C-alpha cells in the first residue's frame, strides 16, 4: 500500500471518529448533562518544494556546505490527528494524538533511510486540564476578578499566533520537527484583574526527545529542540515568565510588559572525534510591546527587548537585544476586504565573534520564537540552522486582505541585512552584511465551512492555501542563485 492510499484510509478513519462523537447537549429529560464529551480529528496534506537555499559555509558550529543547503527538496507531508475532551463544570480535560509521515517524490534512497517514512510514529501531542473564569473570595481580596489555568502538554501557538501575544518570543516548543507539533509541557495561570488588565504566569519544560510515542525504529530518539543538526537529543530547555497585559486610553493603547527566563541544558554536538560538549546557557528577556491604535485606519506596533544571561561554564556573557517597529494603514478603498498596508523593520542583534572558543554570545537568543516568523524557507538552514532568528535587520512592505472566514491574501517584500558581519555566509569569510531580498505571497481559501453548532458530518470543514517565496541572495552569501519555496496545502477538519 503506498503513502497516498494510506493517507486516504487515515482520512476515512478520522471521519468515522468524528461522526460518532457528537458533542453532548441535553439529556432526554431536558436537563443539561453534568458531563460533556466531544471528539474529532483533522488531517493535513501538503507538498513543499524548494531549491537553491544558501547555506552557512563560513565555519564554526553552523558550518554547512553550500551544496548540501542548495540541494533540491520535494516532500509531501501527511499529518493525521485525533482528539477528545471531557468537560464537567468549569473543568475540561483535553487530549490529542498525532502522527506525521512523509513521502519524497524525487528521492531514490531506500525507504528506511528517508526521514519520517511511513508509519513514522504516533505521539502524545496534547494532554492538559484547564478551567476558565474561576472565582473565590480570596482572589477578590487580592484584587483578582477571576482566574484561568491550564496544566499539562499544550501548544503555545494558537489560531492568532502566540497565546501570550508575543510572536517573536514565545510560540514554539518543538522547533526541530517543524509544524508537526508545537507543544510544551507547561503550567499556565492567567489572573484577570478587570476587563482591561491581566497577568499571565507560566513555567514550562521542553524535552529534547519525546518518549511517549509508538512507531518505527527510525523515529526513536528524534531530536525536537536541536539548534544544529548535529546536536544530540539531550538538548532540554526549561523556563518561565510573567506577561502583564493592559488596554489603556479607552482601548487605544494595548501594551504588554514581560520578563521571561530560559535555560538550555548542556548537550553534545557532533560525534566521535568531532564531538563537542556544549555548556548550559541561561537568558532572561525583559521587554515591552506597544500596539497603539491612533484612528480607525492607522495603527502601530512597537516592541523592544533586552536580554541578560550567561554561558554557565565560566559566566561568559550571553543574550542580545531586539527591536520591532511596524506602521499599519487600512485604506477605505475596497473597505469590505480590510486592505491593510504595513511597513515594518525587525532588528535582532548579532555577535561577530560568537563562533570563537571561550567567547561570549551576545547575539539575540530567539527563546521560544523558533518558527516561521518571516519565512517558511529560510528556517531550513540559512538562519544558523533550525529557526534561529538572530543577527538580522529585515524591512518589509506588506499588503493583507481578508475576504471572509479562512479566506485571505498577503504579499510582502523587502531587504534583509546581517546586524554585524559574522563571516558565516561565505567560505572565504568575506562579503558584506547584505543578505538579500526576501519576498512572499500566500492565498488562503475555504472549500467547505461548517455552520455554527453543527454536529456529526455537518461539521466537516475543508480549507486550503498556497504560498510561495523568493529569496535573492546578497553578498553575505557565497551563492547568487535565487532560492525559491512553494507549498500547497489542504486541511480536513471533523
Regions found by a protein language model. Name each.
Residues 155-167, 345-368:
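Surface-exposed extracellular loop regions of Gram-negative outer-membrane beta-barrel proteins
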Residues 94-106, 148-156, 161-162, 197-202, ...:
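Substrate-binding cleft and catalytic face of glycoside hydrolase catalytic domains
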Residues 445-447, 482-494:
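Outer-membrane beta-barrel "beta-signal"
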Residues 23-36, 59, 132-149, 168-357, ...:
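Signature for the C-terminal beta-barrel architecture of outer-membrane proteins
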Residues 58-78, 85-147, 164-173, 224-226, ...:
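Surface-exposed loop and membrane-interface regions of Gram-negative outer-membrane beta-barrel proteins
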Residues 354-391:
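Flexible glycine-rich, low-complexity coil/linker segments exposed to the extracellular/periplasmic environment
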Residues 1-73, 79-92, 337-341:
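N-terminal periplasmic/intermembrane-space "pro-region" immediately following the signal or transit peptide
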Amino acid at each position: 500500500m503506498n503513502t497516498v492510499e494510506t493517507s486516504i484510509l487515515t482520512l476515512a478513519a478520522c471521519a468515522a471518529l468524528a461522526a460518532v462523537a457528537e458533542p453532548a447537549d441535553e439529556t432526554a429529560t431536558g436537563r443539561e448533562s453534568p458531563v460533556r464529551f466531544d471528539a474529532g480529528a483533522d488531517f493535513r496534506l501538503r507538498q513543499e518544494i524548494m531549491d537553491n537555499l544558501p547555506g552557512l559555509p563560513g565555519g564554526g558550529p553552523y558550518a554547512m556546505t553550500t551544496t548540501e543547503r542548495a540541494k533540491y527538496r520535494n516532500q509531501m507531508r501527511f499529518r493525521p490527528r485525533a482528539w477528545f475532551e471531557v468537560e464537567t463544570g468549569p473543568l475540561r480535560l483535553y487530549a490529542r494524538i498525532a502522527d506525521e509521515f512523509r513521502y519524497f517524490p524525487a528521492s531514490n534512497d531506500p525507504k528506511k533511510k528517508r526521514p519520517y517514512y511511513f508509519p513514522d510514529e504516533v505521539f502524545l501531542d496534547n494532554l492538559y486540564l484547564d478551567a476558565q473564569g474561576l472565582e473565590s473570595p480570596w482572589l477578590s481580596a487580592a484584587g483578582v476578578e477571576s482566574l484561568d489555568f491550564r496544566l499539562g502538554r499544550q501548544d503555545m501557538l494558537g489560531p492568532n499566533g502566540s497565546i501570550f501575544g508575543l510572536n517573536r518570543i514565545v510560540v514554539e516548543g518543538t522547533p526541530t520537527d517543524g509544524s508537526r507539533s508545537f507543544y510544551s509541557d507547561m503550567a499556565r495561570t492567567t489572573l484577570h484583574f478587570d476587563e482591561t488588565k491581566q497577568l499571565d504566569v507560566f513555567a514550562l519544560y521542553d524535552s529534547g526527545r519525546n518518549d511517549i510515542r509508538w512507531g518505527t525504529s527510525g523515529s526513536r530518539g528524534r531530536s525536537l529542540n536541536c539548534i544544529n543538526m548535529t546536536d544530540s537529543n539531550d538538548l532540554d530547555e526549561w523556563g518561565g515568565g510573567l506577561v502583564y497585559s493592559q488596554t489603556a486610553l479607552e482601548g487605544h493603547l494595548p501594551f504588554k510588559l514581560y520578563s521571561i527566563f530560559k535555560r538550555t541544558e548542556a548537550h553534545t554536538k557532533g560525534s566521535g572525534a568531532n564531538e563537542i560538549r556544549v555548556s548550559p546557557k541561561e537568558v532572561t528577556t525583559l521587554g515591552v510591546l506597544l500596539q497603539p491604535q491612533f484612528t480607525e485606519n492607522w495603527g502601530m506596533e512597537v516592541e523592544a527587548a533586552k536580554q541578560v544571561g550567561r554561558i554557565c561554564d565560566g559566566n561568559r556573557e550571553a543574550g542580545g537585544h531586539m527591536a520591532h517597529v511596524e506602521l499599519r494603514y487600512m485604506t477605505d478603498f475596497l473597505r469590505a476586504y480590510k486592505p491593510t498596508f504595513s511597513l515594518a523593520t525587525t532588528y535582532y542583534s548579532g555577535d561577530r565573534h560568537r563562533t570563537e572558543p571561550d567567547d561570549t554570545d551576545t547575539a539575540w537568543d530567539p527563546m521560544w520564537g523558533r518558527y516561521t516568523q518571516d519565512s517558511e524557507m529560510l528556517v531550513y538552514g540559512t538562519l544558523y540552522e533550525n529557526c534561529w532568528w538572530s543577527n538580522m535587520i529585515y524591512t518589509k512592505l506588506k499588503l493583507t486582505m481578508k475576504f471572509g472566514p479562512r479566506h485571505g491574501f498577503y504579499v510582502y517584500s523587502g531587504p534583509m541585512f546581517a546586524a554585524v558581519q559574522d563571516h558565516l555566509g561565505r567560505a572565504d569569510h568575506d562579503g558584506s552584511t547584505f543578505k538579500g531580498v526576501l519576498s512572499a505571497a500566500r492565498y488562503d481559501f475555504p472549500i467547505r465551512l461548517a455552520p455554527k453548532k453543527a454536529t456529526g458530518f455537518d461539521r466537516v470543514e475543508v480549507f486550503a492555501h498556497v504560498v510561495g517565496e523568493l529569496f535573492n541572495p546578497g553578498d553575505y552569501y557565497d551563492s547568487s542563485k535565487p532560492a525559491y519555496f512553494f507549498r500547497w496545502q489542504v486541511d480536513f477538519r471533523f
